């Protein structure tokens, strides 16, 4: 490991210290390493051709006109990306789905965009992780 020195303004350092304390880091270096790893992983997953994993979560109204069947159709159209899907009934009207995906990050992003853009889908979020060799 190498030691590096960085300069931070007072407000940013205070924010880093607060984050470190909330998340239980023993020191600033651990927090900065995790922040950097996260930024690098995010960058890697935005490149077409990168293989990885992702979790797509979203809430939708199951009674919305043909929405459930459109989502299923989209899932079948991209079946090679799907590892598993969890379906939860939140209340009488809403369902939460969580899909674990694996494949080319460009294809995963396209699939997520197709699902999230459907009318009646809310709170769509895609969390990507690059595949580590």
Curated annotation (Swiss-Prot):
InterPro entries per UniProt: Acetolactate_synth/TF_NikR_C (IPR027271), ACT-like_dom_sf (IPR045865), Arc_rbn_hlx_hlx (IPR013321), CopG (IPR002145), CopG/NikR_regulator (IPR050192), Ni_resp_reg_NikR (IPR022988), Nickel_NikR_proteobac (IPR014160), Ribbon_hlx_hlx (IPR010985)
Cofactor descriptive note: Binds 1 nickel ion per subunit.
Keywords for this protein: DNA-binding, Metal-binding, Nickel, Repressor, Transcription, Transcription regulation
SUPFAM superfamilies reported in the protein's UniProt record: ACT-like, Ribbon-helix-helix
Functional description taken from the UniProt entry: Transcriptional repressor of the nikABCDE operon. Is active in the presence of excessive concentrations of intracellular nickel.
Subunit structure: Homotetramer.
HAMAP family with a match to the protein in the record: NikR
Protein name stated in the entry: Nickel-responsive regulator
Lineage: Bacteria, Pseudomonadati, Pseudomonadota, Gammaproteobacteria, Enterobacterales
């Amino acid at each position: 490991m190498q030691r590096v020195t960085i300069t931070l303004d007072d407000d940013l350092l205070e924010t880093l210290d607060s984050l470190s304390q909330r998340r239980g880091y023993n020191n600033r270096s651990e927090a900065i390493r995790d922040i950097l790893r996260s930024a690098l992983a995010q960058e890697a997953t935005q490149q077409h051709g990168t293989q990885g994993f992702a979790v797509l979560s979203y809430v939708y109204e199951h009674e919305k006109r043909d929405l459930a069947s459109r989502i299923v159709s989209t899932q079948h159209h991209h079946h090679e990306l799907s590892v598993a899907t969890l379906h939860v009934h939140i209340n009488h009207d809403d369902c939460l789905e969580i899909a674990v995906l694996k494949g080319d990050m460009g294809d995963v992003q396209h699939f997520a965009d197709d699902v999230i853009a459907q009318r009646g889908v809310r709170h769509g979020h895609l969390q990507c992780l690059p595949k580590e060799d």
